[in-house]
Each structure stands twice: as C-alpha cells, then as structure tokens.
C-alpha cells in the first residue's frame, strides 16, 4: 500500500515547513507540516496503525516515538505530544489537507497548551522515606512508651491486648507522619511550580515499599534545579529521591489536546 497517510508525533510552534531529517519509527524521515503558526511532526505512512504480536516490537516502536518527542523538546523549546499511533488518513481529501484543517480548527486550544508547556518538560520525582527509622522514632515516643509501661506486671491476656494496642497506635502515628511528610513535600514543590500531579506508582518491586510519593511536574530548567536543590537538602534526614526527565509533557496536555 502507498504511504498516503501521516503519522503524527506531536505539535510544535514553528510556523513553516521543515525537513527535520530525524529518524523516527522504523527509520522514517520526520518532517513538519505547518498551518496557523503550528507545525506537526510527521512521517509518511500507510493508512493503518503500527501493530505486532511481539510485545518487544511494540515497545521498540513506542520508544522510537518518544525519542522524537524528546529531541523536539530541545530543538523546538517544547512539544505538544500526541499518542503513539496517531495517524491522519486522507479520506475524501489528502492527509496533508486534513492535518492542516485540524491545526486550523484547534488553533486556539493549541495556543493555550503551548503557552503552558513552552520551555518546559515533564519530570518524574519519586521520594522515598526510611521506614525503619520512622518506626523506631514512633516506637520511642512518649505515647507508645506509656502503653509499654502499662504492660509491665499485667497478666498474659491484658499484656497481649496492650501489645496489640501499641502496634495499632504505632501504625496510626506512622501513617499520620507519612501523610504529613507527603503534604509538606507537595506543598513545597508547588511553591516552585503549580503544575504538579501525584501519580500512582507502576513499579512493584521490593525497593518500592518505602515510596512516599510519586510526582509528575512540569518545569523549566530553573524550576527543576530549584526543586532538585530543595530535595538534596533532605538527603540524610530519612529521605531520598530519584529525578527523571525531561520527557514530553503527556500528564499536562491530556485535556487540552483531546
């Protein structure tokens, strides 16, 4: 089949056609098609999605898609990402005509989104706490010590009940502290950038058991350096962190480009 369709990676604010000469999915040449001040990053493709029964092949395709977006962040000072397998078909018109029509019809929404993400990328921040240290601190608190003291000299049944009460109280105090830590980190980072979201962890490994909070933030270089400096001050105080990015800001454009 001929390459009558256009595979679209994302949108940048360029305003003119450019033969970008970046290698996209399956080595396809990526170029831009422009309308109303915005340019779509595209390659020519068939009118069908990229499919494979091999999960590793699909993974490779998605990685290639995301690499184009990562390069676009640096080259065009930002990118409005579109999902893997976004394909514009020709229908009764050419695929290029349909794409330009879409850019024109969505100009106002694209302007709003671009103002939000220009010069910024999405970063993932995972903050961990020292669970053993926290349990030790809570266990040594006056409230828990009083319960333990009351166990002395008591019968086996009452002693067991008091021991269970102590464990329950340790968990309650511990979770209160964890939630307090989480709120404090969130509030402090929000002072740097209002664009942040708590996201569920998709990693299930032993090391994740002490995950305090998993955040996605939209930030420019100055903002992320400030956040990194703040987090580095917390190292050694029972906390550690991992910072990844910048990535295409999927978490912050979902509603704007729908």
Features from the language model and the residues they span:
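An interfacial alpha-helical scaffold signature
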Residues: 1-258
């Amino acid at each position: 089949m001929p390459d009558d369709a256009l595979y679209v990676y994302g949108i940048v604010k360029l305003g003119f056609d450019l033969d970008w000469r970046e290698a996209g999915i399956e080595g396809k040449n990526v170029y831009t098609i422009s309308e109303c001040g915005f340019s779509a990053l595209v390659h020519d493709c068939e009118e069908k999605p990229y499919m494979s029964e091999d999960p590793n092949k699909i993974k490779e395709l998605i990685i290639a898609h995301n690499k184009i977006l990562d390069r676009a962040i640096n080259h065009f000072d930002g990118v409005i990402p579109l999902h893997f397998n976004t394909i514009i078909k020709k229908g009764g018109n050419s695929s290029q005509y349909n794409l330009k029509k879409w850019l024109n019809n969505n100009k106002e929404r694209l302007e709003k989104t671009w103002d939000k993400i220009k010069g910024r990328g999405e970063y993932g921040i995972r903050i961990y706490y020292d669970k053993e240290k926290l349990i030790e601190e809570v266990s040594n608190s006056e409230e828990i010590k009083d319960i333990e003291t009351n166990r002395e000299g008591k019968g086996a049944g009452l002693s067991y009940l008091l021991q269970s009460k102590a464990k329950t109280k340790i968990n309650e105090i511990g979770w209160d502290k964890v939630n307090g830590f989480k709120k404090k980190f969130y509030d402090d980072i929000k002072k740097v950038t209002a664009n942040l979201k708590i996201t569920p962890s998709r990693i299930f490994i032993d090391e994740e058991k002490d995950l305090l909070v998993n955040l996605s933030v939209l930030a420019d270089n100055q903002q992320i350096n400030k956040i990194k400096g703040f987090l580095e001050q917390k190292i050694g105080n029972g906390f550690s962190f991992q910072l990844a990015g910048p990535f295409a800001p999927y978490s912050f454009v979902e509603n704007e480009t729908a």
